[in-house]
């Protein structure tokens, strides 16, 4: 299944949240496209709620269904912890997401492009695979010539805070995954239990 390349604002309005994290998509109209106002939404079934939650998280991280499902299956093989929380933690450890969490990119999509175009180093070595799983203690940095990219400067200037599971050295422009993320440090808009229920019926 190919990755969706249409306008993200439509998906954001449909879900009622900002998928990019900027908030711009729903700042003017916080109701679904096609609705004639915020109070014109139909009731959603249990099936619909589960599907919506799955799509919400998948679209947040920009994965296709196969990538998303495979990661969910892998999370189920982790012995400790809850399946849904482990799944979200694996998503958080993707290289493109860590680049986003460090503030080197304004959105996950922008972070994915930085990785794809070879701007990102992991422990000093170039890694151009967005799905690369960052390990605790690994250092994330930019190639020297990439530190002057305007989009990187703009992203860093806009940083208000970073999640506590990462650290960042502003002078060196390097960051580290200092520990695994805890549930309350991950996406608060997501009910991962609904996603587990969805896949338990499908797999």
Swiss-Prot record:
KW rRNA-binding (keyword) present: yes
Biological process terms in GO annotation: ribosomal small subunit biogenesis; translation
Keywords per UniProt: Ribonucleoprotein, Ribosomal protein, RNA-binding, rRNA-binding
InterPro entries, from UniProt? Answer: Ribosomal_uS4, Ribosomal_uS4_bac-type, Ribosomal_uS4_CS, Ribosomal_uS4_N, S4_RNA-bd, S4_RNA-bd_sf
Judging by the UniProt lineage, the source's domain of life is: Bacteria
Recorded GO MF terms:
rRNA binding; structural constituent of ribosome
Sequence ranges assigned to domain S4 RNA-binding in this UniProt record: 93-153
Record GO cellular component, one term? small ribosomal subunit
According to its UniProt entry, what is the function of this protein?
One of the primary rRNA binding proteins, it binds directly to 16S rRNA where it nucleates assembly of the body of the 30S subunit. With S5 and S12 plays an important role in translational accuracy.
Instruction: Spell out the subunit comment.
Output: Part of the 30S ribosomal subunit. Contacts protein S5. The interaction surface between S4 and S5 is involved in control of translational fidelity.
Q: Identify its protein family.
A: Belongs to the universal ribosomal protein uS4 family.
Its recorded name reads Small ribosomal subunit protein uS4
């Amino acid at each position: 299944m190919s990755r969706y390349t249409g306008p993200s604002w439509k998906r954001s309005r449909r879900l009622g949240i900002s998928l990019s994290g900027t908030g711009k998509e729903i700042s003017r109209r916080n109701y679904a496209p096609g609705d004639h106002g915020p109070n014109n939404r139909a009731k959603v079934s249990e099936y619909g709620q589960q599907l919506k939650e799955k799509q919400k998280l998948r679209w947040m991280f920009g994965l296709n269904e196969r990538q998303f499902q495979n990661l969910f299956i892998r999370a189920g093989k982790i012995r400790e912890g809850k399946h849904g929380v482990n799944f979200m933690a694996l998503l958080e450890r993707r290289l493109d997401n860590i680049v986003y969490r460090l503030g080197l990119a304004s959105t996950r999509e922008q972070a994915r492009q930085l990785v794809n175009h070879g701007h990102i180093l992991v422990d000093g070595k170039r890694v151009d695979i967005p799905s690369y799983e960052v390990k605790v203690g690994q250092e994330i940095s930019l190639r020297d010539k990439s530190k002057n990219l305007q989009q990187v400067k703009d992203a860093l200037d806009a940083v208000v805070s970073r999640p506590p599971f990462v650290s960042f050295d502003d002078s060196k422009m390097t960051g580290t995954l200092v520990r695994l993320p805890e549930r309350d440090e991950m996406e608060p808009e997501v009910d991962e239990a609904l996603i587990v229920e969805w896949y338990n019926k499908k797999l």
